[in-house]
């Protein structure tokens, strides 16, 4: 008969996996409770960071249709269940790992793909959604201003030519 606590933990893990749009797996061995709490606070409300048994996590991941993470499930594992912006969470975790060598990024999962630790760190170097949209809007605004100048140039040239002709005729008369 299954242990009731494990059954409840399994259901909770599966629910967290199904509610997350991405996850990051870390090894937390050597971190103090205070450091773990600091990481949780830095991650914010869109990310739930919790410790899980590897065997339960494997079962929950399989039930949730998530594959390719088994190789990362060795040693103590803490999982960041990310509901918000994955890039922002990856930045926080990567910076924390740089500052606290005891935190090791094992890998992750995003958009249906298992990620290596290097891929998680590469995602952390990307601009977040808001920054990317701002850059795109700025580029579009600049392009539209240039296009408007190009389209207005012939009309402006024609007006100047007509004004010059009018001035010339007025001077001749």
Curated annotation (Swiss-Prot):
Molecular functions per Gene Ontology: large ribosomal subunit rRNA binding; structural constituent of ribosome
Pfam families referenced in this protein's UniProt entry, alphabetically: Ribosomal_L10
GO biological process, alphabetically ordered: translation
PROSITE patterns given in the database record: RIBOSOMAL_L10
Record keywords: Ribonucleoprotein, Ribosomal protein, RNA-binding, rRNA-binding
Function: Forms part of the ribosomal stalk, playing a central role in the interaction of the ribosome with GTP-bound translation factors.
Keyword hit for rRNA-binding: yes
UniProt keyword Plastid present: no
Family matches, as SUPFAM superfamilies: Ribosomal protein L10-like
Family, as annotated: Belongs to the universal ribosomal protein uL10 family.
Quaternary data: Part of the ribosomal stalk of the 50S ribosomal subunit. The N-terminus interacts with L11 and the large rRNA to form the base of the stalk. The C-terminus forms an elongated spine to which L12 dimers bind in a sequential fashion forming a multimeric L10(L12)X complex.
Protein name in the entry: Large ribosomal subunit protein uL10
Entry superkingdom: Bacteria
GO cellular component term, pick one: large ribosomal subunit
Species name: Corynebacterium aurimucosum (strain ATCC 700975 / DSM 44827 / CIP 107346 / CN-1)
């Amino acid at each position: 008969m299954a242990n009731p606590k494990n059954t409840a933990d399994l259901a909770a893990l599966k629910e967290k996996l199904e509610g997350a749009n991405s996850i990051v797996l870390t090894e937390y061995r050597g971190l103090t409770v205070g450091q773990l709490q600091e990481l949780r606070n830095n991650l914010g409300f869109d990310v739930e960071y919790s410790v899980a048994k590897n065997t339960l996590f494997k079962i929950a991941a399989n039930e949730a249709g998530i594959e390719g993470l088994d190789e990362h499930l060795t040693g103590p594992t803490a999982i960041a269940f990310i509901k918000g912006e994955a890039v922002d969470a990856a930045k926080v975790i990567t910076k924390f790992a740089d500052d606290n060598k005891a935190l090791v990024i094992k890998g992750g999962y995003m958009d249906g793909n298992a990620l290596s630790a290097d891929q998680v760190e590469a995602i952390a170097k990307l601009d977040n959604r808001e920054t990317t949209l701002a850059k795109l809007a700025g580029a579009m605004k600049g392009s539209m201003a240039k296009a408007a100048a190009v389209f207005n140039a012939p009309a402006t040239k024609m007006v100047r030519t007509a004004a010059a002709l009018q001035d010339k005729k007025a001077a001749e008369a």
